[in-house]
Structure formats: structure tokens, C-alpha cells
Amino acid sequence: MKRKLLLFLLSICFFLPDFAATGQYNFIRVDGGSGLSNSHVKSIIQDSYGFIWLGTRNGLNRYDGVSMKLYNCYDETLQHGNQVISALFEDNHRQLWVGTDDGVYIQELATGKFSFFDARTESGEQIRYNWIEDILADHSGNIWVNAPNQGVFRYQVETGKLFRYIPCPSKDKSKEFPQSICVDKEGTVWVGTYGAGIYRYS
């Protein structure tokens, strides 16, 4: 698989001198003809095995440089899932975190098995019945999940504890909604909101 991806990348590099000379890029469309489950792609990452993962409004796709493989984001034990994929992240344990319109699922990349992320805060709050905008990790290995209709969650992997943060408690609830999140190289977590500016945690 990696050899196919390498050949694909080399074929692109072959044309780079032309790109530099003309200032133009040639884009090759990867669509339903290649097996893509939906043309509305909301998230893209490359995993540690070299595969490209695409989250769409109708399914999770894995691309090996030639063809697509569609995955059913479904927890067989709990018997529920969701196919509207909005965020993707791979952690240090080669687990793929999949944000959907109904919370977060975790896929073991080695087995392909999905499990629903059902951790709860001390007050019993759970990331569910809400769409996920971002998933990322900070320098300490904590997983941060941005669920705009609920707030920002921090999951301590070592302890299994989940914490919820509301960036800017306000009478206007719509302004509390986090819209984007990132971690800078100093380890500070930045949260952009819908109408109340930007906040940071450190």
C-alpha cells in the first residue's frame, strides 16, 4: 500500500517543475467513481500507516492511493452509530477518533472495530446528541473535543476522567458556542467562539 502511495506522490513530484514555472496546480478529482461514499467531505487526515481518511456526510472512507474502503461507524455492542463524520484524529495508540453528529467513536486501526466514547464528567455529562467540530491532543496527551452545542471537553487519557469547559458563560447562550480550537507549540489551548472572541487555557 505504501509503495502505491509513494508512486502516486512521485508522479505528482514529476510535474512540480511545471507547477513552479506556471504558478498553477493540477488537481485530480477523487469522487464517487473511486468509491467515495459522499461528495461532501468534512474532514481529512493521514494515519500512521499512510492511509488517507475522509469523513463525509455519509460515511467514513479510507483511501490507499488507488481505491476507497467504506467503514460503518457503528458500535456493535451498544448497537448505535452515526455516518455523518465531521472530525478525525489519530492518537498515540493508533486509535482513530471519529467525531460525528452524535458524539465520538473510537476505531482501533489494527482491527477496524468501533466503540462509542461514553466517558462522563463528574456531574454525569456525556458527549452525545451533538455534532463534533474538532478533536486534537495537547502536549500532555489529553484529548480535546469541541462540541459546539455543549462546549469544550478535555479527556485525561491516563485517568479516564472527562472535564467540560464553557469558554464564556453568557446570558446569550449562542455566544458560548465554541467554533474552533487549536494547541500552539507552547501547549496553550485556544478556543474561538461564535460571538465572544477567543479564549485560551494553559
Whereabouts are the PLM-identified features?
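Carboxylate-rich, polar loop motifs that coordinate divalent cations or form catalytic acidic clusters
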Residues: 1-202
